Amino acid sequence: MIKNQVEMFAYAKINLALAITGRRPDGYHELESVMQSIGIYDRIRVTLAEGGIQCSCGEWSGPENLAYRAAEAFLSGLGSSQGIHIDIEKNIPVQAGLGGGSADAAAALQALNKLFKEPYTEEELKSFAAQLGADVAFCLKGGTQWATGVGEELKGLPHAPKINLVLIKPDQGVNTAEAYRAFDQEGKFSHLDYAGWQEALASGRAESLIPLLYNDLEPASMKLLPEIAWVKEELMKQNGCLGALMSGSGSAVFGIVQTEEQAEKIAAIWRERNYHVWVTHTMERGNIYG
């Protein structure tokens, strides 16, 4: 019997650090980032079917969804007209800086490659990923990675220790393009300390990462949505929170917390304030098959 459906768990990411290092002639920004998989995931089911590509993801259904575009690119490369149905159970919030759309696209590529008996190598899948978006290549690989270029060039780092996290997201999101435009007005290019990150991660202690947390987009996104600054400031005051940072272009802020019990207590405070809150942790790998 031919397997006609593959299920994937598509994991979100946070940026433990993000520096904008320059801007290319085509307008894209070059960066250095320490990217990290976390335990919040979307559930993706990809099924061989009839009638072209269909992508079901609530209000994010249809051809604009990155998973749909991933399927288009995959099939086009094979010269195939096979019908594909993609069903996405969405748990990763959008416009949060957590790479939800990218995780879904990466999972769609991985699921399709399995369904079609692996016609593409890992390098070829990475090539598709680079065409789809800056974070898709990371989501194919997952874990803890040093990203450069526009985010598509990856180099492994020591696995982060298991870190307890609280994620808090305001109702309003931040548009990534708007965040970069705001950065262009006032931001300055910078670089991260690769050797410092290697050493901190290799120590196996969450506390070692705190001095290195950094995000060049944070001031820009805080200007667009000042609530982010308030969330970060309040989170830092709470018992057990070692450090906090906005992820990516926001609007989600993560707090690194000493224990899971403390993370749950902090989360309860923010739920009472009617915020979107998740208690999670770092992951050693990214997307996995269901």
UniProtKB/Swiss-Prot annotation:
Enzyme class: transferase
Pfam family, one: GHMP_kinases_N
Gene3D superfamilies: 3.30.230.10, GHMP kinase, C-terminal domain (3.30.70.890)
Keywords attached to this entry: ATP-binding, Isoprene biosynthesis, Kinase, Nucleotide-binding, Transferase
InterPro entries xref list: GHMP_kinase_C_dom (IPR013750), GHMP_kinase_C_sf (IPR036554), GHMP_kinase_N_dom (IPR006204), IspE (IPR004424), Ribosomal_Su5_D2-typ_SF (IPR020568), Ribsml_uS5_D2-typ_fold_subgr (IPR014721)
Residues that, per the record, bind ATP: P93, V94, Q95, A96, G97, L98, G99, G100, G101, S102, A103
Enzyme Commission number(s): 2.7.1.148
Biochemical pathway: Isoprenoid biosynthesis; isopentenyl diphosphate biosynthesis via DXP pathway; isopentenyl diphosphate from 1-deoxy-D-xylulose 5-phosphate: step 3/6
Top-level taxonomic group: Bacteria
Active site per the UniProt annotation: K13, D135
Gene Ontology biological-process entries: isopentenyl diphosphate biosynthetic process, methylerythritol 4-phosphate pathway; terpenoid biosynthetic process
Catalyzed reactions per annotation: 4-CDP-2-C-methyl-D-erythritol + ATP = 4-CDP-2-C-methyl-D-erythritol 2-phosphate + ADP + H(+)
Gene Ontology molecular function: any one: ATP binding
Role description: Catalyzes the phosphorylation of the position 2 hydroxy group of 4-diphosphocytidyl-2C-methyl-D-erythritol.
Family: Belongs to the GHMP kinase family. IspE subfamily.
Record protein name field: 4-diphosphocytidyl-2-C-methyl-D-erythritol kinase
